[in-house]
Swiss-Prot record:
<keyword id="KW-0689">Ribosomal protein</keyword>
<dbReference type="InterPro" id="IPR037147">
    <property type="entry name" value="Ribosomal_bL28_sf"/>
</dbReference>
<dbReference type="Pfam" id="PF00830">
    <property type="entry name" value="Ribosomal_L28"/>
</dbReference>
<dbReference type="InterPro" id="IPR034704">
    <property type="entry name" value="Ribosomal_bL28/bL31-like_sf"/>
</dbReference>
<dbReference type="InterPro" id="IPR001383">
    <property type="entry name" value="Ribosomal_bL28_bact-type"/>
</dbReference>
<dbReference type="GO" id="GO:0022625">
    <property type="term" value="C:cytosolic large ribosomal subunit"/>
</dbReference>
<comment type="similarity">
    <text>Belongs to the bacterial ribosomal protein bL28 family.</text>
</comment>
<dbReference type="GO" id="GO:0006412">
    <property type="term" value="P:translation"/>
</dbReference>
<dbReference type="InterPro" id="IPR026569">
    <property type="entry name" value="Ribosomal_bL28"/>
</dbReference>
<dbReference type="GO" id="GO:0003735">
    <property type="term" value="F:structural constituent of ribosome"/>
</dbReference>
<protein>
    <recommendedName>
        <fullName>Large ribosomal subunit protein bL28</fullName>
    </recommendedName>
</protein>
<keyword id="KW-0687">Ribonucleoprotein</keyword>
């Protein structure tokens, strides 16, 4: 399973760990992914999405119906 948000498309980023001596080693910044169930009133069912914390706030703001319509327009099966 990919570490990618289904709503925002956010995935891992690459950066550096930097020590006090300014030595740099590669590291990955992983998105804050949560597996969440959302109740879709119009379809009378639960939808499980793997989303970031930012996407949860987006769903709270715009509504699950608008977000699902956007996902379906992109061709994702939900």
């Amino acid at each position: 399973m990919a570490r990618v948000c289904q709503v925002t498309g956010k995935g891992p980023m690459v950066g550096n760990n930097v020590s006090h001596a300014n030595n740099k080693t590669k590291r990955r910044f992983l998105p804050n992914l949560q597996s969440r169930r959302f109740w879709v009133e119009s379809e009378n069912r639960w939808v499980r999405l793997r989303v970031t914390a930012k996407a949860i706030r987006t769903i709270d703001k715009n509504g699950i119906d608008a977000v699902l319509a956007d996902l379906r327009a992109r061709g994702e099966a939900v």
